[in-house]
Design a protein with these regions (language model features):
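A short, well-structured catalytic beta-strand-centered motif of the EAL phosphodiesterase domain
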Residues: 2-40
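Charged helix-capping and loop-helix junction motifs
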Residues: 90-94, 121-124, 173-180
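C-di-GMP signaling machinery
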Residues: 1-2, 29, 39-49, 89, ...
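Glycine- and small hydrophobic-enriched segments that form the cores of compact globular domains
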Residues: 19-24, 31, 40-42, 47-51, ...
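Catalytic core of bacterial c-di-GMP phosphodiesterases, primarily the EAL and HD-GYP domains
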Residues: 48-121, 197
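Conserved ATPase "switch" residues in P-loop NTPase domains
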Residues: 130
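EAL-family c-di-GMP phosphodiesterase catalytic domain
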Residues: 10-15, 24-30, 80-82, 109-116, ...
């Protein structure tokens, strides 16, 4: 497994303000490929998926530890169902003690399947993570899978708008208005709001015009391998 850093930009400061650590594997073509499809592939048991997700999490956190404070805030993906497995909790407590992680604002980014987890269980897991000093983000809001009800009850620290809300937003006024409404909601609730999947200057300008504070996407650069 190979950790890659994808920067998150502050649109008011013009600076890199956070990073998302993505985990890749080398496919048959020799290129680095996303692990997500493997985690959701049919035919794998829940235990096998959780074990792979834990390997990804460990890879990401160890890479952040080696980064020696390069970033103050880091996002790492987590499949919500992995929190149902006890090895996650023993692992996360151990990894949080890695050098450099204690001073970092660590955000676990719950992937779009978070709506599949029982709401009470999700809330309980989130409280336990916050007790460990870990913040919570909801990924892919607007994808049609991420439930607004679950998001509201979870009360995350960050929300990431799905790229489907960003793609061609400069040509779609209703889409731009929705991004602006979400940005206003996030500001009112003191929640960080990030638009992901920005690929063109026009999309970036539309996101800025919608008052979105943070952005991420290939327009700024591709994920880069970490040491």
């Amino acid at each position: 497994l190979f950790p890659c850093a994808h920067e998150i930009h502050g649109l008011k400061s013009g600076r890199v303000e956070a990073v998302e650590v993505l985990t890749r594997y080398r496919g048959a073509s020799g290129l680095l490929e996303r692990v997500g499809p493997l985690l959701r592939a049919e035919g794998h048991s829940a235990q096998a998926r959780a074990a792979l997700d834990l390997r990804c999490l460990e890879t990401a956190l160890e890479a952040l530890s080696r980064s020696r404070g390069r970033w103050d805030c880091a996002f790492v993906n987590l499949e919500p169902m992995t929190m149902e497995h006890p090895p996650f909790w023993t692992g996360i407590e151990r990894w949080l003690r890695l050098p450099g992680l204690q001073s970092m604002r660590l955000v676990l980014e719950l992937t779009e399947s978070f709506s599949e987890l029982d709401l009470e269980a999700l809330q309980g897991h989130s409280r336990r993570l916050r007790d460990l000093g870990v913040r919570i983000a909801v990924d892919d809001l607007g994808s049609g899978v991420a439930s607004l009800t679950h998001m509201a009850r979870l009360a995350p620290d960050y929300i990431k708008a799905d790229q489907s809300l960003v793609r061609l937003v400069h040509r779609r006024p209703y889409q731009a208005a929705l991004l602006n409404a979400l940005a206003h909601f996030a500001r009112r609730m003191c929640v960080g709001f990030i638009a992901e999947g920005i690929e063109t200057p026009e999309e970036l300008q539309a996101v800025i015009d919608a008052d979105v504070p943070w952005a991420q996407g290939y327009h700024f650069g591709e994920p880069m391998p970490m040491a």
